[in-house]
Amino acid sequence: MSFKLNSLKDNAGSRVGRVRVGRGIGSGLGKTAGRGQKGQKSRSGVSINGFAGGQMPIYMRLPKRGFNNVFSKDYAEVNLGVVQKLIESGRLDAKNPIDHQALKAAGVARGGKDGVRILGKGEIASKVAFKVAGISKAAREAVEKAGGSVEIIARRNVEKTDA
């Protein structure tokens, strides 16, 4: 058998037509339309989410845990190796101070409503000036060893100050 685009066919039974229920007793799915007789599940809008048939539901069996700390800081974290790659590719200019806006424009600082924090993974060879909300001890040592500088700026809700 030759294989041609005009001779392609579906496999038998791969496309089963939709069954129209409740269309007369001769179809076998008339009257109650496969829902059985009376009761909650025969009515429209059937299921009750989370209802476990009188058994204690899972969401009530498990304990309430944790809380949201209002004082927690949300930093966008960027590693030194990533910054070096951006400088080498020309997406960051080492002559200008590197801050949250510059890293966001380069596409590496996502989120971080409290600013950006630089971490020490990777190597930095360029002499750069960072203006960031936080920096790790190892990252600060690596930047200063390469001849760069670090200025910590306290920022709250960086997203709101962009406007």
From Swiss-Prot:
SUPFAM superfamilies: Ribosomal proteins L15p and L18e. One of its GO terms (biological process) is translation. One of its GO terms (cellular component) is cytosolic large ribosomal subunit. Residues 27-46 are annotated as: Disordered. Gene3D superfamilies: 3.100.10.10. GO terms for molecular function: rRNA binding; structural constituent of ribosome. It holds the Pfam family Ribosomal_L27A. Transmembrane segments: none annotated. Residues 27-37 have a biased composition (Gly residues). Keywords: Ribonucleoprotein, Ribosomal protein, RNA-binding, rRNA-binding. Belongs to the universal ribosomal protein uL15 family. Binds to the 23S rRNA. Part of the 50S ribosomal subunit. This is Large ribosomal subunit protein uL15.
